[in-house]
Amino acid sequence: MSVTPAGLRIPPPERRAPIHDDPVAVHGRPPVMWLLAAHGRSGAGTLAQIWAPAGDARRGWPAADRHRNVVVVCRTDRAGLDAAHDLLLQAQAGLVGDCTLLGLVLVPDAPGPLPKTLRRWAEVVASAAPAVWRVPYVEDLRTHRQNELAIWTPTEPDPPPPGRMRAPAPSTTSPHHDLAAIGREIFTAARNASGH
């Protein structure tokens, strides 16, 4: 039984993610890290497609799975940040089964910097997470279906960053350098949380 810290604002049940009673992973190798979408179109499905050791948690906490390391994923618009904040508070209250919250992935909702008010709110939301990863805006991802995207695996070297004379490779032939680097950081955090 978890004890909720005094003064912690707990979101109402309708704003929490459910705790899955049955395993989410039913086929193949179980994911080492789960991506929990804070809302629809968060980018969790796309990132789960790109990062081989990740799985889409299907909008709930994978408490019945072998590995229970979770990253909340949200867009950086107001609704996305609000939804992520609710899930982070749910985790702080211990209402996530036996899952371990690794952190928060912020997916840009548009190119360019966040407006000041959103930037401030994103900082508040991020302060509720043990770690934060900021995904860059990758225009190329918009033009491809998920099943066309190149997959990053921890056993392969990360793709080189684009240089002055070298444009980034298309997302269908190689994962974006920053996405591979973030995937590796989360994978390492998941392995460390699992005691490997």
Segments (PLM) and residue ranges:
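Short, aromatic/basic amphipathic alpha-helical patches
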Residues: A48-W51, K116-A128
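Inter-motif core of Ras-like GTPase G domains
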Residues: R59-T76, L88-V105
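Cytoplasmic membrane-interface segments at the C-terminal ends of transmembrane helices
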Residues: Q90-G97, E123-A128, N192-A193
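G-domain G4 guanine-recognition motif of GTPases
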Residues: A38, R75, L102-K116, V135-E148
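Active-site-adjacent loop/helix micro-motif of nuclease/hydrolase catalytic cores
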Residues: R78-L87, P113-L118
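Beta-strand-loop-alpha "switch" segments that mediate conformational coupling across diverse proteins
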Residues: V124-E156
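Extended, compositionally biased accessory segments flanking or bridging domains
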Residues: M1-D65, P154, P159, S171-S174, ...
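Non-catalytic sensory/regulatory segments that transmit input signals in bacterial signaling proteins
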Residues: P162-A169
